């Protein structure tokens, strides 16, 4: 993740933003600012997860679609 922000730190910050928004004590402007920040953090986290998934698939030589197909065949 960019600027040295780690995935776990981003998740923690995102959880705090959700708590603040759920309380409903922020002004409209503060809520919008926090919402925007939360969306940005969520996108970064999703990108990090996608990259990790791709790396795992590359390292293991598997594709999630192939695994699903083989699971379906064995359960029939």
From Swiss-Prot:
Keywords from the UniProt entry: Cytoplasm, Exonuclease, Hydrolase, Nuclease
Single GO biological process annotation from the record: DNA catabolic process
Gene3D superfamilies given in the database record: Exonuclease VII, small subunit
Q: According to its record, what are the GO cellular component terms?
A: cytosol; exodeoxyribonuclease VII complex
Compartments annotated for it: namely: Cytoplasm
Q: Its catalytic activity?
A: Exonucleolytic cleavage in either 5'- to 3'- or 3'- to 5'-direction to yield nucleoside 5'-phosphates
The molecular function terms of the Gene Ontology recorded here are:
exodeoxyribonuclease VII activity
Q: Does the keyword Membrane apply?
A: no
Out of the domains of life, which is the source?
Bacteria
Q: Quote the EC number.
A: 3.1.11.6
| UniProt signal peptide | none
Subunit description: Heterooligomer composed of large and small subunits.
Function statement: Bidirectionally degrades single-stranded DNA into large acid-insoluble oligonucleotides, which are then degraded further into small acid-soluble oligonucleotides.
Please give the family membership noted in the entry: Belongs to the XseB family.
Protein's UniProt name: Exodeoxyribonuclease 7 small subunit
Q: Which organism is it from?
A: Legionella pneumophila (strain Corby)
- The gene that this protein is the product of is xseB
């Amino acid at each position: 993740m960019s600027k040295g922000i780690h995935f776990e730190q981003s998740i923690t910050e995102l959880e705090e933003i959700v708590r603040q928004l759920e309380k409903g004590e922020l002004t409209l402007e503060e809520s919008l600012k926090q919402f925007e920040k939360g969306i940005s953090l969520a996108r970064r986290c999703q990108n990090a997860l996608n990259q990790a998934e791709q790396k795992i698939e590359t390292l293991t030589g598997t594709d999630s679609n192939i695994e699903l197909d083989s699971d379906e065949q064995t359960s029939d």
